[in-house]
């Protein structure tokens, strides 16, 4: 109390938790109880009125004295040893795809858990300090939402950010979220959600424990949840918007005290698994189990980073790992996943905790026990079902969804020599994958046990469009074969499970110059049916992102009998039928087959020609599934690449006009070679020189030039091609184009320069050959300065 006469300020602190010492109990028996104490500050007036400045100083003096006395009595907890200000970028807030309440983010504020969902275990200063000190608290917290779209670009969605003080999943509606401390955000505008120490205080005089292996109510701290309501629509295209809405950042000052190094806490992992099939099962009195494919990113990460259990299970029970994972479902499918009662609300709420069940996977699935809270997971008390899934829903397939998962704890906190885990480490894939494709239902007009329709031409009927797989406007091919794929499984080259790679940058599927699908993997198969013809089949694994329909000239392959006992492989039916093809969102295997005159260059080849009626095709590796529609569920194995390097484009000429087309590098516009224009006055001597230039030995035919760095490469490639059964002439030609000699480089350089000067093609080639002969005679290639232009 404060008396008016002497200006004394008295502060009374009662720290006995509401209990007083009994009168009949001795003093010694009440030790350890809370105690009461008073702080009196003498702020007596000295006879004259204080001005505003003196009053401010007096009030500050009172506060300092009170705070000092409170600290002496231990009411405010330990003094911070170190404080760290930091801004953590946590990722993006996606759009709402269902129109109902969807959770987009759940941010746990324990410093060792504040990471972005990139799959990285890298840590910053906050995580490093969290692994060194035993207690933490927040001085303030600002959650910044930076808009990623304009205020008029999208509409139909409201965003609400709220504080969950217990960090426990709950069944909360949009109205329930409004009962929390929250902030409503308008899409297209930046916002900051500000929290004070009173909102963030821990149970130990404002402090929280850092080690996540301890009691959940003492370690996690509060959490920040971000929800959206209403389907996000594009204002310009009048269709659903699927991009990000906000970038989320945490700006705060973490304080730490009580040094206790737990270095393994910095290695906790957070990542995202897209398009993973999730299902739940359980029966009356049994734990709720979540199942995911063992080839999914989440399953492989959990197996690799889940530690062996430190306790044994009872008879008849499964053993679980000691590592706990928080799972956040950010996709619309949370409301569609069928869950046994009574924990339907937990799954629809969008986030829960799981622990891996030890043992080998069954039927290609990994199993996890589901827990409604982190404390239940630490205590190994899974959610128990009171019934099973209704009979009519048991046959429903697993729902593809997007999971964000966070490793919550690390049972071993020191630097162990070898971490005991339930599986092997995740291999780092390269650009080559073994891809297992599961055939889906045939796409109309294809049907089971019948021929497979393919697009025959490179043009569509009037007013329609073909499907193009393109790198740019000059390098593309037209889709011919189209096979629906129900499931794609990725493996590394040594057949270790791998996660899905990102789409190939620069490649896309176009219809009338509009992107409809992404290309994830490619492969080409080059075969040589004869010395005068090469067959090239390109396959593309694509994922349609926007449904579309095309009308094309369709035909099919058939077996054609030759004369006598000879049987040709198969031909394309000459007559075509105009039919519609409807592509819905999902995976497809698209193919294109072309024939051309050899030789074929190294690298990826772009060839866009229609299927020829009079050409017999061989059944190569990329066309086997185009004879008849494969049965549903059939699995095809391909080795595919996720990069397209050394792109080459074939000049489009008829076979009769030019038996040796020119290849041009499509990656560098400055190096594109053009085929010299043929004239009627070309002499027989010029033709002989052409043949001489194209058919040369490993060394230049114009003289003995000194060896260069590619000599060994030429010999190795030539020997390899001949050993594989190729003719010496063809092997030599391929070797020449792969590793040209200095004379050939000089000849080509002079050829290009003289063409640019305006000389006729015949004279240009004669001068180029003469320059190459001169270089071979002098043994001194002109590699700098003037290239020796002929006049």
UniProtKB/Swiss-Prot annotation:
The record marks 314-315, 394-395, 424-425, 648-649, 657-658 as: Cleavage. Residues 72-264 are annotated as: Inner core. Residues 649-791 are annotated as: Acidic. Residues 425-648 are annotated as: P2 globular domain. Residues 677-694 have a biased composition (Acidic residues). GO terms for biological process: clathrin-dependent endocytosis of virus by host cell. The keyword Ubl conjugation does not apply. Residues 395-424 are annotated as: Core attachment. Residues 1-71 are annotated as: Basic. The keyword Zinc does not apply. Residues 20-36 have a biased composition (Basic residues). Residues 1-55, 677-713 are annotated as: Disordered. It comes from the Viruses. Pfam families: Astro_capsid_N (PF03115), Astro_capsid_p (PF12226). GO terms for cellular component: host extracellular space; T=3 icosahedral viral capsid. Keywords: Capsid protein, Clathrin-mediated endocytosis of virus by host, T=3 icosahedral capsid protein, Viral penetration into host cytoplasm, Virion, Virus endocytosis by host, Virus entry into host cell. Belongs to the astroviridae capsid polyprotein family. This is Capsid polyprotein VP90.
């Amino acid at each position: 109390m404060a008396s008016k006469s002497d200006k004394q300020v008295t502060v009374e602190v009662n720290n006995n938790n509401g209990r007083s010492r009994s009168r009949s109990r001795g003093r010694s028996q009440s030790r350890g109880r809370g105690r009461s104490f008073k702080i009196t500050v003498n702020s007596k007036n000295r006879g004259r009125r204080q001005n505003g400045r003196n009053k401010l100083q007096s009030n500050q003096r009172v506060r300092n004295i009170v705070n000092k006395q409170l600290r002496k009595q231990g009411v405010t907890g330990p003094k911070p040893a170190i404080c760290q200000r930091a801004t953590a970028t946590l990722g993006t807030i996606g759009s709402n795809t269902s129109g109902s309440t969807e959770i987009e983010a759940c941010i746990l504020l324990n410093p060792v858990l504040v990471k972005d969902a990139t799959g990285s275990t890298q840590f910053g200063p906050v995580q490093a300090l969290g692994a060194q000190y035993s207690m933490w608290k927040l001085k303030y917290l600002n959650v910044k939402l930076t808009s990623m779209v304009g205020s008029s670009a999208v509409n139909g969605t409201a965003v609400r950010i709220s504080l969950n003080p217990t960090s426990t999943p709950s069944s909360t509606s949009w109205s329930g979220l409004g009962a929390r401390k929250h902030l409503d955000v308008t899409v297209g505008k930046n916002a900051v959600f500000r929290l004070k120490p009173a909102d963030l205080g821990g149970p130990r005089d404002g402090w929280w424990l850092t080690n996540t292996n301890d009691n959940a109510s003492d370690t996690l701290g509060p959490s920040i949840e971000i929800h959206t309501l209403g389907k996000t629509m594009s204002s310009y295209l009048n269709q659903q918007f699927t991009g990000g809405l906000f970038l989320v950042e945490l700006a705060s000052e973490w304080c730490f005290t009580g040094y206790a190094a737990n270095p393994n806490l910095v290695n906790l992992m957070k990542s995202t698994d897209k398009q993973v099939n999730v299902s739940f099962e359980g029966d009356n009195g049994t734990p709720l189990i979540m199942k995911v494919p063992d080839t999914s990113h989440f399953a492989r990460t959990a197996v690799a980073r889940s530690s062996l259990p430190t306790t044994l299970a009872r008879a008849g029970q499964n053993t679980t790992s000691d590592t706990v994972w928080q799972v956040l479902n950010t996709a619309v499918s949370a409301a569609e996943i069928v869950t046994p009662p009574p924990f339907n609300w937990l799954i629809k709420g969008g986030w829960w905790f799981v622990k891996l069940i030890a043992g080998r996977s069954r039927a290609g699935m990994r199993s996890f026990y589901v827990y409604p809270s982190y404390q239940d997971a630490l205590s190994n008390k899974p959610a128990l079902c009171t019934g099973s899934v209704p009979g009519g829903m048991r046959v429903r397939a697993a729902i593809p969804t997007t999971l964000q998962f966070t490793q919550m704890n690390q049972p071993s906190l020191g630097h162990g020599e070898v971490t005991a885990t339930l599986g092997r480490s995740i291999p780092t894939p390269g650009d080559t994958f073994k891809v297992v494709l599961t055939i889906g239902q045939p796409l109309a007009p294809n049907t089971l046990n019948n021929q497979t329709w393919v697009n025959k031409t490179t043009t569509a009927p009037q007013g329609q469009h073909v499907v193009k797989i393109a790198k740019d406007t000059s390098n593309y091919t037209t889709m011919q074969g189209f096979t629906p794929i129900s499931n794609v499984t990725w493996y590394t080259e040594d057949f270790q499970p791998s996660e899905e790679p990102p789409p190939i940058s620069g490649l896309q599927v176009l219809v009338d110059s509009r992107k409809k699908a992404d290309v994830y993997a490619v492969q080409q198969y080059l075969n040589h049916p004869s010395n005068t013809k090469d067959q090239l089949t390109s396959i593309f694994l694509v994922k349609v992102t926007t449904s579309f329909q095309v009308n094309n000239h369709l035909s099919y392959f058939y077996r054609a009998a030759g004369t006598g006992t000879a049987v040709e492989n198969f031909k394309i039916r000459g007559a075509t039928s105009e039919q519609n093809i409807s592509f819905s969102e999902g995976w497809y295997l698209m193919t294109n087959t072309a024939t051309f005159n050899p030789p074929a260059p190294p690298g990826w080849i772009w060839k866009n020609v229609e299927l020829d009626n009079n050409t017999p095709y061989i059944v190569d590796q990329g066309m086997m599934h185009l004879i008849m529609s494969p049965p549903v569920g059939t699995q095809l194995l391909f080795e595919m690449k996720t990069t397209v390097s050394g792109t080459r484009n074939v000049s489009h000429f008829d076979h009769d006009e030019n038996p040796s087309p020119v290849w041009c590098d499509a990656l560098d516009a400055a190096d594109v070679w053009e085929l010299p224009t043929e004239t009627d006055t070309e002499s027989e001597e010029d033709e002989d020189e052409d043949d001489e230039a194209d058919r040369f030995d490993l060394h230049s035919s114009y003289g003995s030039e000194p060896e260069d760095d590619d000599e060994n490469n030429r010999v190795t490639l030539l020997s390899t091609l001949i050993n594989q059964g190729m003719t010496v002439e063809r092997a030599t030609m391929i070797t020449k184009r792969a590793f040209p000699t200095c004379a050939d480089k000089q000849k080509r350089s002079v050829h290009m320069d003289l063409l640019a000067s305006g000389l006729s093609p015949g004279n240009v080639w004669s001068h180029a050959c003469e320059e190459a002969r001169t270089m071979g005679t002098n043994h001194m290639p002109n590699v700098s300065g003037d290239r020796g232009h002929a006049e």
